[in-house]
């Protein structure tokens, strides 16, 4: 069988073998990080919040964040890049680097962040959310779990409510006002 996704633990093993030095795994489950055991840390987004500085931050397959099925995916991806930039710039030494692996190197978000033009992104994103009636211009609720189907049935007949689904046992409810 072929590994389709490497995963953090397997990536740590591969990197240790390649570099012939210890690599520390950092995830939200990591208890204590011993910064004296290694100079290389590999992990999930949690690493951005658990490490104070870095010489290099690498995002492998950043498209998973940039193109995720969440209406806030670009905003969340941008936040990760900003956190990474803070890590490589926070030490009183030569600034480090943030490297992003993507199949979409010309995505507008990369250019705007590189130029430090967050205002343009915010303006475009605000117009997009207004057009699609996403928050804060509309309201969205994801209903799933035990009792979800009965709850959805109870919403039948309510005007100004759009119910999408079911999709894998979940419904998306959209409304232009909170009532």
Question: Which role fits each region the language model picked out?
Answer:
Residues 138-142, 170-177:
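Short, hydrophobic beta-strand segments
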Residues 146-150, 174-179:
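Helix N-cap motif at beta-to-alpha junctions
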Residues 160-167:
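Short beta-strand elements
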Residues 15, 167-170, 179:
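C-terminal active-site/capping subdomain that shapes the small-molecule cofactor and substrate pocket
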Residues 148-160:
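Conserved interdomain hinge at the start of the Helicase C-terminal
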Residues 1-150:
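Inter-lobe coupling/hinge segments of SF2-like helicase ATPases
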């Amino acid at each position: 069988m072929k590994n389709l996704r490497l995963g953090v633990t397997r990536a740590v093993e591969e990197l240790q073998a390649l570099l012939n030095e210890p690599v520390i795994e950092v995830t939200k489950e990591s208890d204590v990080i011993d910064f004296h055991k290694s100079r290389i840390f590999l992990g999930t987004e949690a690493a951005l919040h658990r490490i104070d500085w870095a010489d290099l931050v690498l995002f492998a397959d950043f498209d998973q964040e940039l193109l995720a099925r969440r209406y806030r995916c670009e905003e969340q991806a941008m936040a990760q890049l900003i956190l990474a930039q803070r890590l490589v710039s926070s030490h009183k030494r030569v600034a480090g680097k943030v490297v992003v692996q993507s199949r979409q190197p010309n995505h507008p978000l990369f250019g705007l962040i590189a130029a430090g033009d967050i205002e343009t992104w915010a303006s475009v994103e605000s117009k997009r959310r207004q057009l699609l009636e996403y928050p804060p211009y509309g309201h969205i609720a994801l209903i799933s779990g035990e009792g979800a189907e009965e709850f959805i049935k109870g919403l039948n007949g309510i005007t100004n409510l759009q119910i999408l689904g079911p999709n894998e046992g979940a419904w998306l409810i959209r409304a232009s006002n909170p009532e």
